[in-house]
Amino acid sequence: MSNDFLICPKCQSKNIQNINARKWFCPDCGFDLYNNVAAAVGLIIEDTDGTLIFEIRAKEPRKGFLALPGGFCDPDESAEQAAFRECREETGVEPSSIKYIASFPNTYIYKEIKYKTCDLFFSAEFTKTEKTIIEQMQGEESEVTGFKSIRINSIDDIDNLPLAFESAHKALKVWFSQNHK
């Protein structure tokens, strides 16, 4: 399914046009609708043993693939607020602090509609406890079927991960280059 309108939502004309996949325009009534990207966040979580923690996705798109905890920013919410909220919702734990890593464009296909996103990635720090971070996690059943700890020793390790989204591969490579010099 394409993201094109068949009729203008304002005047119901069939002359609505998609201009360079950036906006819809109706020459009959002047209606303009820009195809803006949605903001989303992801968190890179390093456990106390040096492994990275990934979610196993419970739903489409890419059900069963690995993902970084995260999700879409809500209206009137900053990327940082979304990162804390999404981590808490999906894992049951909240970071004590986060640090911006990088952002990358992504395409998120949901119910046959393509959503263009700008994914902002953060590394997450947690207060030390007797338990590892993964032992404290409780996944949100509608989002996560479980968690997996994986040791990353090289860029090749990142390339071989069955990640749901390419933007996460790119963010992990930036994180790895910053933390393994």
Where are these regions (language model features)?
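Acidic, metal-coordinating catalytic segment for phosphate/diphosphate chemistry
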Residues: 1-43
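Short connector loops at helix/strand junctions that flank enzyme active sites
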Residues: 21, 36-40, 61-63, 68, ...
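Active-site donor-binding loop signature of nucleotide-sugar glycosyltransferases
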Residues: 28, 57, 70, 149-154
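Conserved N-terminal beta-strand and adjoining loop/helix that marks the start
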Residues: 28-52, 69-72, 123
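Beta-strand scaffold of nucleotide-dependent catalytic cores
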Residues: 42, 53-56, 135-136
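Conserved Nudix-box catalytic region and its N-terminal flanking loop in Nudix hydrolases
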Residues: 47-89
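Unchanged
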Residues: 73-99, 104-164
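Charged phosphate-binding loop/patch that engages nucleotide di/tri-phosphates or the phosphate backbone
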Residues: 164-181
